[in-house]
Design a protein with these regions (language model features):
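ATP-dependent carboxylate-amine ligase
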Residues: 2-136
Length: 136
């Protein structure tokens, strides 16, 4: 798979361990993580640090076996980066693949005044294919 696969106009699929995202100037992003296999706290903290410093206060959505850990580490990392800022990095954890896919479908249908890109980052290809299929 390419490092960043374009799935439709503004939706991209990215494999967690080998993929990469390059921010586009004047675009906002929403990021959706499928995290079934990655539970290394140091790796997650490095990912959170990289993403929050690159994309700032955007929305990070998590689904999968390790979503609670990812959400907690992203929240903790955001507090380290923005300790006194009242506007927080937004994180959401979804209990089911269906609710996660529904949220992704919903945001893809919305109209935005500012160009918006959506990234589906995954560490479980089977679940990734399932979510992509549910959003078509």
């Amino acid at each position: 798979m390419d490092r960043c696969e374009k799935l439709r106009d503004n939706l991209y699929g990215v494999e967690l361990l080998t993929g990469s995202i390059t921010p586009v100037k004047e675009h906002i992003v929403q990021i959706f993580y499928i995290v079934n296999n990655t539970d290394n706290s140091e790796f997650i903290e490095n990912e959170a640090l990289l993403m929050i410093t690159q994309f700032g206060k955007t929305e990070y959505n998590f689904c999968g076996r390790h979503s609670e850990l990812w959400q907690r580490i992203f929240n903790d990392t955001a507090l380290k980066i923005y300790p006194t800022d009242s506007e927080k990095v937004i994180t959401r954890k979804y209990e089911s693949t269906e609710k996660f896919a529904d949220e992704l479908s919903l945001v893809l249908q919305e109209k935005y005044f500012v160009p918006t890109d959506f990234y589906l980052i995954y560490d479980d290809e089977e679940m990734y294919r399932q979510v992509v299929g549910m959003t078509e």
